[in-house]
Amino acid sequence: IVLQNEHIYILDKKQATIFIFTHNGKYQNKIANQGRAPGEYLSISDFEVYDSHVYCLSRTNQKIFKYDTNGVFQNTIQVNDWYDCFHIQNDSTIYLFSDYSNNQLYNYVVYNPITKEIINRLDKFKKNQGFSFEYSPFHCLDSNLLVSEQYEHTIFSLTSQEKKPLYSFIFNTSDQIPPFIYTDREKTYHFLQGKETLRRIKGLYISQGTLNIVYSIFYKNSGIK
């Protein structure tokens, strides 16, 4: 869900459709262009609203599709790899994210859509694991871009030059994250079924100078909370 310019944008991944509502909940329009023709996508993995346009990332197509708020296709940005999520920082900087599952073998790729060049690659891994949790790690806090990843107890700051630890938290859960978290995501997923551990830090916001986090933990007696 994205709230911007007095509008509410909601992605329905199953229908590959973005529904657009006014700020008071009145339906206004939708972007529903699933298909194989020019300007159509096979799926929507993630979307962003930037500069009064809607950008839709399709992992399957390896493209970002740009539409106006009436659903009229504008153009595409070819990203040429498997990415789950993205963040548009400005006109010349897009952060692309893949959870250990692309051929670049970097979790973060910084791309300039104007020059069509890769600015930098960050957070290297050894093997394309082909397994995705389908979440966005990106959080914009004031003028800073922060990221939180699946099972990670640490929040990182991200720039085009580096990813570095910023905050770390201790969660008193009865089970621990296994050491193979970074080398085998699918094995980690199955190993942690039914175990009491952090799943993900899902949201960040600052109130009266205090950092607040929203997170999910699986509890053995009550499920994910």
Regions found by a protein language model. Give the residues of each.
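Eukaryotic scaffold repeat domains enriched in small/polar residues
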Residues: 1-225
